[in-house]
From Swiss-Prot:
Domain of life: Eukaryota
Signal peptide: 1-32
Source organism of the structure: Zea mays (Maize)
InterPro entries (UniProt xref): Kiwellin-like, RlpA-like_sf
SUPFAM superfamilies: Barwin-like endoglucanases
Gene3D superfamilies named among the record's database cross-references: RlpA-like domain
GO terms, molecular function: enzyme inhibitor activity
Identification of the protein by name: Kiwellin-1
Glycosylated residues in this chain: 59
Length: 198
């Protein structure tokens, strides 16, 4: 039968190394818990007040409502070899629901082109401009698409953004050609996907 003194000795053996690890700061803690980055999340950076306007609802776009508050983000979830995202539908054509010309090129793109816009954090100040990403759908289909624009998570509800709210922080906004190549139903408006840099 264990004694009280024996129990105290056992607690000391277990607790002291843990306490030493915690007291030696973040560097030691990262060795004790190497998956700490998985706990980091992208938090909202603020909000904007909605303003309605001439919103093109061609692809089921959500239009801003006067006075409503919309969350903004300056970040996106961490990029991995298979980053989870929500694919939304967007026309990059002139007069389409995409608003202004593509940020990367200053051009519009016909709906037959496989192009995408990425949420602000993934767009990363334009570092992915004119680069291809590989998109994988749950049905097993994949497509390579060119990054041409930012799906802005920091602003919205204005003419440049088709009077739509700021993008969520986990969006890959794909052209109709991307949806067709993936064999997805455009009437759904959004789909769960994964993507990776090529």
């Amino acid at each position: 039968m264990a004694t009280v003194g024996g129990n105290r000795a056992l607690y000391a053996v277990v607790a002291l190394p843990l306490l030493a690890t915690l007291l030696h700061g973040p560097m030691r803690l990262s060795h004790a818990f190497p998956y700490r980055s998985l706990l980091q999340t992208c938090q909202p950076s603020g909000s904007i007040q909605g303003r309605s306007g001439n919103c093109n609802t061609e692809n089921g776009s959500e239009c801003c409502k006067n006075g409503r508050r919309y969350t903004t983000y300056g970040c996106s979830p961490p990029v991995t070899g298979s980053t989870r995202a929500v694919l939304t539908l967007n026309s990059f054509a002139e007069g389409g629901d995409g608003g202004g010309a593509a940020a990367c090129t200053g051009k519009f793109y016909d709906d037959s082109k496989k192009v995408v816009a990425l949420s602000t954090g993934w767009y990363n100040g334009g570092s992915r401009c004119r680069k291809h990403i590989m998109i994988h759908a749950g049905n097993g289909n994949s497509v390579s698409a060119l990054v041409v624009d930012e799906c802005d998570s920091t602003v919205g509800c204005d003419k440049d953004h088709n009077f739509e709210p700021p993008c969520r922080n986990n969006i890959v906004d794909g052209s109709p050609a991307v949806w067709d190549a993936l064999g997805l139903n455009k009437d759904d408006g959004q789909a769960q996907i994964t993507w990776s840099d090529e």
